[in-house]
Amino acid sequence: MKRSFLYVIFSLFLLLLPIGQTTANSNDSIRLSLLTCAPGEVIYTLFGHTAIRYENPSQGIDVVFNYGLFSFDIPNFALRFSLGETDYRLGVIDYPHFAGEYAYFGRSVWQQTLNLNNEEKAELIRLLQENYRPENRVYRYNFFYDNCATRPRDKIEESIAGKVIYPVEPQDGSRTFREIVHQYCKGHPWARFGIDLCIGSEADRPITQRQMMFAPFYLMDAFAGAQITGDSIQRPLVTDSELIVDATPEEDESFWIPTPLQSALLLFILTAAATIYGIRRRTGLWGVDLILFGTAGIAGCILAFLALFSEHPAVSSNFLLFVFHPGQLLFLP
């Protein structure tokens, strides 16, 4: 009887062993990765993009969690955008469609495989699924502090049992938001001019390495050298990095447009010529005053509106209001 009992127990053990191995192998086959996408040509794509890829081959899952979705069709979009009340949302799309879209627009994509254990993988998946619930997926977008790059970083850090230690950045505390904006607006002078016009002195303060991660490629570089510490064990945050969409950027086929500097020089020359002409003719050219004071006054109205009412970061302390201010409209002829 005793031998029969032991035989039954041993048989059950053999039957359960493959199941346990299958579960472990299934968990081990799950891969979670940080995706970093190259910049595009449209102004809201100039800084690149970040997303999280979730692969579970045993269940046929290969999807991308994307915190960068918004719609121009929402009511009063332009007003809400100027007020800094633009709501973004988390979306989920299958990876082939995601990769195909970026390849179509000539934007490369890099993948960094996250070095998470099974518990951390399960926790990150749970956090993403919880965040994707209809009542949780919408969030108030903030360009510098809460965007499509900072959200994935925060969720990944939240899922890790230990602490993520980022490598010491030589430029930590020496760079500013404005400098990073200039870096990504290279080749787009009017975008740089418009952003420079709107953001104030707060954008010129030195920022930390963590604050630099609002830009996707700064986040990618930080992840590449980051370490996870906990229980006296240290491991890299990223185990593998690869270029998964190798795309050729679209050629710029737009017609020539003068830069802001060229436009300013042209305006100066025309104004000087009109002034000389008016002095020699002993006549006032009210049209010139109308253009100059009208343009400066309208620009001042926009800057004052942003400084007083907008939730956008770094727009309240804008000293350009001393140059462009609404009061100049009072001097219109």
Where are these regions (language model features)?
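N-terminal accessory segments that precede or flank the first globular/catalytic domain
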Residues: Q21-S82, L237-T239, L243-S310, V315, ...
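Residue-level signal for short amphipathic helical patches enriched in basic/charged
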Residues: N147, L320-L321
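A generic alpha-helix surface/boundary motif
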Residues: P18-I19, T150
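Bacterial N-terminal signal peptides
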Residues: Y7-P18
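Positively charged n-region of N-terminal signal peptides that target proteins for export
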Residues: M1-Y7
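Generic low-complexity segments that are intrinsically disordered, proline-rich and/or Lys/Arg-biased
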Residues: M1, I19-T22
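Generic ordered-secondary-structure signal
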Residues: L14, N142, V323-F324, F331
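Soluble extramembrane regions of membrane proteins in the secretory/endomembrane system
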Residues: N25-E251
